[in-house]
């Protein structure tokens, strides 16, 4: 499926059913009292996050969504049926923005809790039947309420992938090979830059405890100026905002002997320019493709990193060398760093059984 991380949709909740204007009519009871039932409430539009989806592609294909209307009330005090709710499943980590008529946006939901749901458009309340208005002073009310219209909203959906670890690096650093080594992900791998055009997700399973898992996001290669839109990284930098930590991979081919860690510093600067908080995010620094250099050259780099106080892992993702040490470090970080809090907490909204502010009545002839 094509990866899509933004979409705009229109949602409309169902209209409440009209209340019924009816009187009891039976043999030998010429003046039966009112017996009009209430209309059913309209169905609501509900958003439910799920980890089964990784793209908003379906919401690019279909943009309009409507819940069912409530049925009108009937005689003999029969209430109308409530309209069926429309439940839309969205990828876990989706941000929901309401867009007004002038194009202004306001975030209304952060779907980062797999057990949470959000009522984005509430169905209209059903109108009261004339039996509801019977009183000691009004024995035969000849009016009933109409149902309320359902809420309508225009929404912009923005997916920010929820992952434990984010893989970063310059193009052709070997991130895709690395993620294919440690998980069941099978991204496209080739010896040219920008092989990865969209984020790939992999799940690493603990060999001792199969229920212990780590989700890893392979972010497309970043280049200098990514925060301003250069290269491919500009669109995907947002996907690292919610990771617990980052795994920064640098190809040994990109190392300058005079200043070997420039590649790490360049990407870190791009992260900071995109969001200053990312500068402080925990990182694991990895030099990949050590099989392309002699053991003596690799040892010299190890010593230089140690002298400068940098803990850097040296690996060959192609041949599996050094992978186990990186994986152990990733598990340690995953277990010590909490997932980031949602930007907007979902709140349960209690339905209030209140009267209509403005009663719209339907009269019958005398």
Swiss-Prot record:
Ranges for domain Obg: 1-162
Check the record and name the CDD domains matching this protein: Obg
Q: Which HAMAP family match?
A: GTPase_Obg
Q: Which cofactor does it need?
A: Mg(2+)
Xref: Gene3D superfamilies:
GTP1/OBG domain, P-loop containing nucleotide triphosphate hydrolases
Q: What is the name attached to this protein's record? A: GTPase Obg
Positions of the OBG-type G domain: 163-335
Q: Which organism is it from?
A: Nitratidesulfovibrio vulgaris (strain ATCC 29579 / DSM 644 / CCUG 34227 / NCIMB 8303 / VKM B-1760 / Hildenborough)
> Lineage of the source organism?
Bacteria, Pseudomonadati, Thermodesulfobacteriota, Desulfovibrionia, Desulfovibrionales
User: Which family does this protein fall into?
Assistant: Belongs to the TRAFAC class OBG-HflX-like GTPase superfamily. OBG GTPase family.
The reply on keyword Nucleotidyltransferase is no
């Amino acid at each position: 499926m094509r990866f899509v991380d933004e979409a705009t949709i229109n949602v409309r909740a169902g209209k409440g059913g009209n209340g019924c204007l009816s009187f009891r009519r039976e043999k030998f009871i010429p003046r039966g009292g009112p017996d009009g039932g209430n209309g059913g409430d309209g169905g609501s539009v509900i958003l439910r996050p799920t980890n089964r989806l990784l793209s908003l592609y379906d919401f690019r294909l279909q943009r309009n969504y409507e819940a069912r209307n409530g049925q009108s009330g009937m005689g003999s005090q029969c209430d109308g049926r409530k309209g069926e709710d429309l439940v839309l499943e969205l990828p876990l980590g989706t941000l929901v923005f309401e867009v007004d008529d002038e194009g202004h946006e306001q975030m209304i939901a952060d779907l980062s809790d797999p057990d949470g749901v959000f009522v984005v458009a509430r169905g209209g309340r059903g109108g009261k039947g004339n039996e509801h208005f019977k009183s000691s002073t009004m024995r035969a009310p000849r009016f009933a309420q109409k149902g309320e219209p359902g809420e309508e909203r225009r929404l912009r959906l923005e997916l920010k992938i929820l992952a434990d670890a984010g893989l970063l690096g310059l193009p052709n650093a070997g991130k895709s090979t690395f993620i294919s080594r440690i998980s069941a992900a099978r991204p496209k791998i080739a010896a040219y830059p920008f092989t990865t055009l969209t984020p790939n997700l992999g799940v690493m399973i603990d060999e001792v405890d199969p229920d212990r898992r780590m989700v890893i996001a392979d972010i497309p290669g970043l280049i200098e100026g990514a925060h301003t839109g250069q290269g491919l990284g500009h669109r995907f930098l947002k996907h690292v905002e919610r990771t617990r930590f980052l795994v920064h991979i640098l190809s040994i081919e990109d190392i300058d002997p005079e200043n070997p860690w420039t590649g790490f510093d360049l990407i870190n600067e791009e992260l900071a320019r995109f969001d200053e908080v990312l500068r402080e995010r925990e990182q694991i620094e990895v030099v990949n493709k050590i099989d392309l250099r002699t053991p003596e050259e690799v040892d010299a780099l190890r010593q230089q990193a140690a002298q400068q106080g940098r803990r850097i892992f040296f690996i060959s993702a192609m041949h599996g060398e050094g992978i186990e040490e990186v994986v152990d470090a990733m598990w340690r970080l995953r277990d010590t760093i909490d997932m980031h809090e949602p930007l907007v907490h979902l709140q349960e909204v209690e339905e209030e059984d209140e009267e209509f502010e403005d009663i719209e009545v339907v009269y019958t002839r005398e």
